Amino acid sequence: MQVLHVCSEMFPLLKTGGLADVVGALPAAQIAEGGDVRVLLPAFPDVRNGIPDSVLVAEIDSFAGRVGLRYGTYHGVGIYLIDAPWLYERPGSPYHDQSMNAYSDNHRRFALLGWMACELAKGLDRYWRPQVVHAHDWHAGLACAYLAANGHPARSVFTVHNLAYQGLFSAHHVPELWLPPSFFNIYGLEFYGQMSFLKAGLFYADHITAVSPTYAREITRPEFGYGMEGLLQERQRQGRLSGILNGVDDKIWDPSHDPRLTARYDADNLKNKAKNKLHLQKAMGLKVDESLPLFAVVSRLTSQKGLDLVLEALPALLEQGGQLALLGAGDAVLQQAFLAAAADYPEQVGVQIGYHEAFSHRIIGGADVIMVPSRFEPCGLTQLYGLKYGTLPLVRRTGGLADTVVDCALENLADGSASGFVFDDCDAVALGNAIRRAMVLWSRPKHWRHVQRHAMSVDFGWQVAAQEYLSLYQRLS
């Protein structure tokens, strides 16, 4: 089965969010399961620099000018690069300029990504041709539309990593992008008078997947559907919508081999985890005391991630003797509020604004609890990292958080299935109650260790997801 993943970023070549982690791990896992899998990416500077030995496969005239298709390998995965420097050779973010303004030609930049995927399906590389094109999020959504417009030269899968990002552009770009004018209607690309790259993926794909079973159900409801719920309900009725849970890349996230940690550890040697905690407390300027429960946040600072709830619940957490270590960036108001808390409580609150991959490992390896109180969370990877590292997740019951964390309720503690702390209502009171339950369990070290060891034993590796996707591809073909 020849499969082409189409996406805008891939860890560790280029990462702005969890999408990159998924694409950085899933193709390799599918290859390990016997798939013939490659990836198509725009040749952004970091991507091009990470694959310096790529060779030119083909050149082709497109709506964006004459572009090159290059091919190389990265850690055993074949990578196609779209060589169009006038579109992709820009510093910083692949999506916006240094003033955080989206590039005015993003419609062209990411339409080309979808168009080139279709050209590969039509035989642009005469030595390799995908049977399935697997597009990820809005950036690649037009791949499904171009395949439909060209007689379906390959089957298509579209994965929703986050429905909130829809890739909306003016309708007048439709003919410029070599799309059939008939595609711009309610049964196609049109979304409230604009062209939606996300809707293109949802409408034209042979099958839609969401990144967790719960999120696949949630997005058929108005509160999570962002206006797409009607289409998604129809795809659900047709059996063309399913949820496949993301996994953890064991080569990157494994506390027994993680070079970023002060001390490596596993479920049978948790004493070394305490060394990471003491190092983290010192690095964040907190009181260095192993007995204090250390809560952590590694997240974009947005209301979607529930960080305003963390602020509301923070006084109670501190009153109960807890500490908070936060790594993240985002909303300026939230950033300032957390920095103010760190200034007011320097021994209990440590804040680092920004995102540093290595430091995220040290926080997750050193903390006792990782908080993910999201209003919605398609899958979430942070809680999976927490489970793997014995850093108990405290999460809201939504999306992939609901699918991966089992609450420390008495019955779950009794049968050994508990792996973290789960709350339902989206408010600071519910979060505060979950924090209290974490504090109570912390005061019982024997029970805490029991839950830790179970959490670390749960397998969220990519092999299961890789097999599920390969089975889906087989059904489609």
UniProtKB/Swiss-Prot annotation:
Matches recorded under InterPro entries: Glyco_trans_1, GS/SS, Starch_synth_cat_dom
Protein's GO biological process: glycogen biosynthetic process
Pfam families, A to Z: Glyco_transf_5 (PF08323), Glycos_transf_1 (PF00534)
Enzymatic reactions: [(1->4)-alpha-D-glucosyl](n) + ADP-alpha-D-glucose = [(1->4)-alpha-D-glucosyl](n+1) + ADP + H(+)
Family stated for the protein in its record: Belongs to the glycosyltransferase 1 family. Bacterial/plant glycogen synthase subfamily.
Residues the entry annotates as binding ADP-alpha-D-glucose: K15
GO cellular component: cytosol
Organism: Serratia proteamaculans (strain 568)
Keyword Transferase: yes
Single GO molecular function: alpha-1,4-glucan glucosyltransferase (ADP-glucose donor) activity
Domain of life of the source: Bacteria
Protein name: Glycogen synthase
Keywords carried by this UniProt record: Glycogen biosynthesis, Glycosyltransferase, Transferase
Enzyme class label: transferase
Keyword Glycosyltransferase: yes
PANTHER family: ALPHA AMYLASE DOMAIN-CONTAINING PROTEIN (PTHR45825:SF11), GRANULE-BOUND STARCH SYNTHASE 1, CHLOROPLASTIC/AMYLOPLASTIC (PTHR45825)
UniProt pathway: Glycan biosynthesis; glycogen biosynthesis
Record's function text: Synthesizes alpha-1,4-glucan chains using ADP-glucose.
UniProt EC number: 2.4.1.21
